[in-house]
Regions:
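Short, well-ordered beta-strand elements
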Residues: 1, 35, 45-48, 67-70, ...
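Gly/Pro-rich hinge or "lid" segments in bacterial periplasmic/extracellular proteins
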Residues: 22-24, 116-175, 180-182, 190
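Sec-exported extracytoplasmic/periplasmic mature domains
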Residues: 19-23, 42, 55, 67, ...
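Aromatic- and charge-enriched surface segment that lines or borders ligand/interaction sites
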Residues: 35-80, 95, 101
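N-terminal lobe/hinge region of extracytoplasmic solute-binding protein
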Residues: 1-41, 72, 140
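Surface-exposed binding/hinge segments that line
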Residues: 83-126, 146-151
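Short helix-initiation/N-cap motifs at beta->coil->alpha
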Residues: 43, 87, 97, 140, ...
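A structural "hinge/loop" feature
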Residues: 1-9, 33, 60, 82, ...
Length: 191
């Protein structure tokens, strides 16, 4: 998500999104961190209701403030594509600890879908770190996987967490069936 450096292979598995898609259904989203949504008929705003059971890997609850922090961090310190893609978002606000509202400058249905796919970062972890700088520290995530081990430029191993908060959600049935996944790097990118 940051501008400098290349993200580690498998790092996209470290963070859950507000909602998740199905690999066999086009444009269908299912609740994950957000257990419910509400949106205007003209597609100019959307409210995500955060599942009160949603937790980061340190056991702290995922809140609307984390979503606001994530969006603002991506817009100010993330890759330039975020600014371009989300330029139609007028503002984002936490209505309470479990409701977050995105208001758009104009109607844009596909942007509502994209916002639902937003990975959520833990504010309490990232607010004291420089998000724009590459790191070799294992980040705190929200998904069912964390980095188990790595060797820079050679491999990354992610491991499944047994106490993942969303392991029993219907959307996760049949997913996350491997205890470990290893990503190897090769000097030749064509390999």
């Amino acid at each position: 998500y940051a501008q400098r450096g290349d993200a580690a292979q498998g790092s996209e598995q470290l963070y859950d999104t507000l909602m998740t898609s199905s690999d066999d259904e086009i444009d269908v989203l299912y609740p994950l961190i957000a257990e419910q949504i509400e949106y205007s008929k003209d597609y100019t705003w959307i409210i995500f209701y955060i599942n009160k059971k949603a937790k980061f890997q340190d056991g702290k609850n995922i809140t609307a403030q984390d979503v606001v922090f994530t969006f603002n961090t991506f817009m100010t310190q993330g890759v330039p594509q975020f600014k371009s893609y989300y330029k139609n978002v007028a503002h984002v606000e936490a209505l309470d600890s479990h409701k977050v509202k995105f208001t758009l400058k104009k109607s844009q249905l596909d942007l509502l879908h994209s916002l639902a796919s937003l990975a959520v970062l833990p504010k309490h972890y990232w607010e004291t770190r420089d998000f724009s700088e590459p790191t070799t520290q294992i980040p705190l995530g929200s998904s069912g996987f964390t980095i188990d081990s790595f060797k820079m430029g050679q491999y990354v191993v992610v491991k499944r967490l047994k106490d993942y908060w969303a392991k029993d959600l219907a959307v996760n049935k049949g997913r996350h069936n491997f205890d470990f996944i290893r990503y190897d790097y090769y000097k030749d990118e064509i390999v």
